[in-house]
Amino acid sequence: MKPISERRCGKDGVSAGIARKFGSNGFRVVLLSRTETSLQRSLEDLRQVHIESYGITADASDPDPIKAAFTQIENLYGITDVLVYNAAHIAPGDALSLTEQQLIDDLKVNTVGALTSAQQVIPDMVERKQGTLFFTGGGIALNPNPLYASLSIGKAAVRSLALSLAETLGPHGIYVGQVLIADHVQRGTFYDPDRIADVYWELYTNRDRKEYLFKE
């Protein structure tokens, strides 16, 4: 059975780039997306380049659908070898305009969903003493953007989560890495999703860095 790489579909192209990279290297890809339309579009693109891929819809802001999705994945496709969490809620606004509820709602996607997703695959990885967890971060985790206060907070939080997991899971043979993307992802630029995907593959292969700042 081929290894399984799971990820959450995104609109920025990072998910698609990673899926193509891992899929072209023998991974069977399972996508999780909030909407069926986005999911089917992503699957169609992958299958056109002959990548074995499947998909399930789940809302990253709600733990119950996430847990149900991972149960379904294990039942249908087997144990997860690589998890990539790429979901984010990107909403403009400075800290003065940010409400408590907005921050809570955004953190459900930007951070809590990452923890919930990881918790679904960690027990099997610990038992097998192998596995990889990836989290897509942002340069704003290091240098907050005042115009995107909530996202800056969320990316800082998920960075801390990833670093904490790396320390905790490393002794169990599990690699945890993250890529901090410092600008807008756009095809044909330095921040092309396929260039970013190459970094994920490099980290997966070498397993020698806890984080990589992708910055021009």
Feature map (PLM): residue ranges:
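Amphipathic alpha-helical dimer-interface segment in Rossmann-like NAD(P)H-dependent oxidoreductases
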Residues: 109-127
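Catalytic Tyr-X3-Lys loop
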Residues: 89, 96-115, 158
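Active-site loop of short-chain dehydrogenase/reductase
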Residues: 2-3, 79-80, 94, 125-137, ...
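The beta1-alpha1 cofactor-binding region of Rossmann-like NAD(H)/NADP(H)-dependent oxidoreductases
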Residues: 36-37, 57-69, 100
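Canonical Rossmann dinucleotide-binding motif of NAD(H)/NADP(H)-dependent dehydrogenases/reductases
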Residues: 1-29
